[in-house]
């Protein structure tokens, strides 16, 4: 290794250094499969060698379509070790939606989880650039389907770590955002950006070597992958992985594994509190609770703190493009600043600006912009959107917010009407375009409305063509045939007209105010 590379810090370096410090400590566990850091590191380097033997080169995109598993975590570091670029794909997307991502990023290899066989078989016809499909189910004793390579084959080669040739500024992953346009954007994140974000989480979210994490939210999301799994591995924590987010399974694992650290959107926390098992579960080990993707209702927060008196809560706000954590509301501020996103984390600088780029006054609404080494390098193959996002030298988040006299940021709206439902991002425009395919539709506006379970529920407000009748069931069934399940509206509201401003723009905020109580009953 030459002197120029001695200080190089890539994702595989974080695992290698942890392994040197804690070789025999539990790193990854799922069901009865337990790996120490030494086991985990050795497996990662062997899989890296296996990928290279298949012809995957540094810079190639390696996609993964899988639910949570220990093999997912293994693939994450193996791809990094050989210089590949990981592209996690949301397993809830339908085949056409997933194919767009795979074709756009020009993935050469697709890692397929045990529950995604049907989708993968459709993708083989839709994505001609994919040269190899690797069956992760072989790690759980499942027979390998025809035309797929068993994951076990990747473990049979020589170990490979391309640290000497890796540059921390090179891409480590591309995560596709649920953009406000119909086509998602691929956020390219370098090794360095992700590791800068790890540092922010280690400091501001107080992630430590003694933590035992339960990873139940999807690892295809950068929240679970990069705000919790990655920082935990870097510092040497223990990581329990599950693909079953049901309240009963989560409560059982929280008790049996003595989980100390748990992240979930408010919808999951609410489901845990409402489970008949909750009162019977020993949660005495649970010291740190994290939430994000939506605001935690104050009454729910109080109930969590009353039911688990030793727990401390953090609210994490951010987005894929900043790897992902931008601000954190600390435990001592949860009830003092309810609804706030907190203050910028260690390696992020944030402002709230008006339309001409000036800081807004205290209490005034403006757009959140960031400057940080955590930020994406670019939107993949999209220089125009990249330039727009960094207009003025700051990254434009698209979120509207206020800032108070203590510097606390509160998100008040999403500039482009993104809906966050159950922790998933949904583009209102994408759902609108699906509904507009129905011939009886005159106008439609898709909004998120408060919901006791989903926090925000996708809701379509529809105006039909004159003289036409349309049922809620028909619209929902139509959407279900062309959209992923989490994007399908929970309710269709029929109205005579949509509110507009003087320039003719639909006033979605007025719609949200008018129909705010639809899901109360």
Would you name each region that the model predicts?
Residues 3-11, 16, 24-69, 73-77, ...:
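Conserved AMP-binding/adenylate-forming core of the ANL superfamily
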Residues 9, 24, 157-176, 182-183, ...:
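Conserved pre-ATP/AMP-binding loop-to-beta segment of ANL
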Residues 36-38, 172-196:
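Conserved AMP-binding A3 loop
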Residues 53-54, 81-153, 466-468:
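Structural core segment of the AMP-binding/adenylate-forming
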Residues 61, 67-95, 103-109, 211-212, ...:
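A short helix-loop-beta submotif of the ANL/AMP-binding
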Residues 93, 110-112, 262, 356, ...:
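AMP-binding/adenylate-forming catalytic core of the ANL superfamily
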Residues 195-212, 220-260, 275:
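Conserved AMP-binding/adenylation subdomain of ANL enzymes
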Residues 259-263, 273-336, 349:
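Gly/Ser/Thr-rich phosphate-binding loop
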């Amino acid at each position: 290794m030459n002197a120029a590379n001695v200080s190089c810090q890539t994702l595989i370096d974080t695992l290698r250094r942890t392994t040197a410090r804690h070789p025999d400590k539990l790193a990854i566990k799922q069901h009865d499969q337990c790996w120490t850091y030494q086991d985990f590191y050795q497996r990662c380097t062997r899989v890296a060698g296996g990928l290279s033997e298949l012809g995957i080169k540094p810079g190639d995109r390696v996609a993964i379509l899988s639910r949570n598993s220990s093999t997912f975590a293994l693939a994450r570091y193996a791809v990094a070790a050989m210089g590949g670029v990981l592209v996690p794909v949301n397993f809830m997307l339908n085949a056409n939606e997933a194919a767009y991502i795979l074709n756009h990023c020009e993935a050469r290899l697709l890692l397929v989880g045990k529950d995604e066989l049907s989708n993968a078989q459709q993708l083989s016809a839709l994505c001609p650039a994919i040269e190899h499909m690797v069956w992760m189910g072989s790690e759980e004793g499942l027979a390998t389907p025809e035309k797929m390579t068993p994951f076990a084959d990747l473990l049979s080669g020589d170990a490979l770590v391309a640290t000497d040739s890796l540059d921390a500024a090179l891409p480590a992953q591309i995560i596709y955002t649920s953009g406000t346009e119909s086509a998602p954007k691929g956020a390219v994140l370098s090794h360095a950006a992700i590791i800068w974000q790890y540092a922010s989480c280690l400091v501001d979210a107080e992630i430590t070597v003694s933590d035992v994490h339960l990873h139940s939210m999807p690892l295809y999301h950068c929240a679970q992958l990069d705000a919790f799994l990655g920082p935990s591995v870097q510092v040497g924590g223990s990581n329990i992985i599950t693909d079953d987010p049901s309240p009963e399974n989560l409560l059982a694992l929280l008790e049996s594994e003595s989980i100390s650290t748990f992240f979930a959107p408010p919808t999951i926390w609410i489901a845990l509190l409402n489970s008949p098992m909750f009162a019977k579960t020993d949660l005495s080990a649970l010291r740190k609770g994290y939430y994000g993707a939506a605001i935690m209702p104050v009454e729910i927060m109080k109930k969590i703190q009353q039911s688990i008196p030793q727990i401390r809560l953090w609210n994490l706000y951010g987005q894929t493009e900043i790897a992902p954590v931008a601000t954190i509301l600390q435990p001592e501020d949860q009830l003092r600043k309810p609804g706030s996103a907190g203050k910028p984390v260690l390696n992020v600088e944030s402002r709230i600006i008006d339309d001409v780029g000036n800081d807004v006054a205290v209490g005034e609404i403006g757009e959140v912009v960031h400057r940080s080494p955590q930020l994406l390098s670019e939107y993949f193959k999209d220089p125009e959107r990249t330039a727009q996002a960094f207009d003025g030298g700051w990254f434009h988040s698209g979120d509207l917010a206020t800032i108070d006299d203590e510097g606390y940021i509160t998100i008040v709206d999403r500039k482009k009407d993104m809906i966050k439902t159950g922790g998933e991002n949904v583009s209102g425009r994408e759902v609108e375009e699906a509904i507009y395919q129905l011939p009886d539709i005159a106008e439609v506006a898709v909004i998120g409305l408060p919901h006791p379970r989903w926090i925000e529920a996708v809701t379509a407000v529809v105006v039909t063509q004159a003289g036409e009748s349309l049922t809620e069931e028909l619209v929902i069934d139509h959407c279900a045939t062309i959209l992923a399940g989490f994007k399908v509206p929970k309710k269709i509201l029929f109205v005579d007209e949509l509110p507009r401003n003087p320039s003719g723009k639909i006033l979605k905020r007025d719609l949200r105010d008018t129909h705010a109580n639809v899901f109360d009953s």
